[in-house]
């Protein structure tokens, strides 16, 4: 990551919108751990689809996603993943400069994932996930809603993420700046 202080100061940034998965922590290995932990669910979902049809499958998937998949993800993040030092440095620098911060994730359980990473959620003015907005990244409409929740002007906002095609496109869609976190 480029020197955070110079990025924030050069562009007179007043707000930062951080992606969570892949940005605040390195998510490599998480997908494999999820498959190993949840392998037993796959035959159940396939059998249920054949037996009950699409309506029941949608209900099962929603329940499974909220009560099995996401809690498993939070547990694995807490056990095997750590915050990126450069992300912690960025958060600290934003706090020092009085820059408003939001965490905007394509997935749910934002507060729970932050807790699993031992990152204090109270440092952020806004915690939001795409499902609660009803729109996934790179939706400019969703990014605009995040800016509204944060009370931030796009030209004074820096989006930080690990995927240019999602996080970067969302930032550009509202006229905000973007900083790519690379492995």
What is the predicted function of each stretch?
Residues 88-96, 147, 168, 172:
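Surface-exposed amphipathic alpha-helices with a cationic face
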Residues 1-60:
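Active-site neighborhood of HAD-like aspartate-dependent phosphohydrolases
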Residues 104-158, 165-166:
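Substrate-recognition "cap/lid" segment bordering the active-site pocket of phosphatases
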Residues 156-183:
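Acidic, Mg2+-coordinating phosphoryl-transfer loop and its flanking beta/alpha structural elements
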Residues 61-73, 123-126:
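Short, basic/glycine-rich phosphate-binding loops at helix/coil junctions
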Residues 3-4, 12, 72-103, 140:
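Short, acidic loop-to-helix structural element flanking the phosphoryl-transfer center
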Residues 25, 80-84, 115-119, 123, ...:
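A generic "structured core" feature
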Residues 9-11, 97-99, 150-156:
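Glycine-rich phosphate-binding loop signature in dinucleotide/nucleotide-binding domains
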